[in-house]
Design a protein with these regions (language model features):
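Active-site-adjacent substrate-binding region
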Residues: 74-164
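Acidic/histidine-rich catalytic neighborhood of metal-dependent amide-processing enzymes
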Residues: 1-93, 122-126
Length: 164
């Protein structure tokens, strides 16, 4: 059975692309900084897309500070979490990226601190990036106890919550 993937992980794609759109429309440009959205595939098939990227590009950015934020399943607002550990706790994500996310969440214009957590089951692409030597962390909003849309045919656009 196929899962349409509206929440896992079209919502993550929306967040990444929307961030770029917001920067452009606001006229925000950074000196000596590049912001991009990397959309990897095959996360559900063993993090293959992110893993392939890390293997292909390992060492290319060693002289450039590089941070990766993996947005995954942005549906349940009350469960928005910064994941400092991944792959059911087996992989430690970057404390630097977690600190940057904390700083952004605590900014007076945002003022919405997020809890830290461990990906309770499975993994996000941040695990592959962290294992591959990149500084990465994940942000997701999914009820860990009840997600009737998760990994099944019910993960359709009508299950998305745009406010999240």
């Amino acid at each position: 059975m196929l899962s349409p993937g509206a929440n896992d992980n079209l919502t993550g794609v929306f967040v990444a692309v929307s961030a770029l759109k917001c920067l452009k429309e606001s006229g925000i440009r950074y000196e000596n900084t590049e912001v991009c959205a990397l959309l990897t595939g095959s996360e559900e098939a063993g993090l293959r897309g992110a893993t392939a990227f890390t293997k292909r590009h390992k060492g290319e950015n060693k002289d450039v500070e590089t941070y990766i934020i993996a947005f995954d399943t942005m549906r349940d607002y009350d469960y928005m979490t910064i994941y400092h550990r991944d792959m059911t706790g087996m992989v430690k994500n970057s404390p630097e990226v977690v600190a940057l996310l904390d700083e952004a969440c605590n900014d007076p214009d945002v003022n919405h601190p997020l809890p830290h957590g461990v990906v309770p089951f499975g993994a996000s692409d941040a695990a592959a990036f962290s294992r591959g030597g990149f500084k990465a962390a994940a942000v997701a909003g999914q009820n860990p106890k009840y997600a009737p849309y998760y990994h099944n045919r019910r993960d359709t656009p009508d299950q998305m919550i745009p406010e999240t």
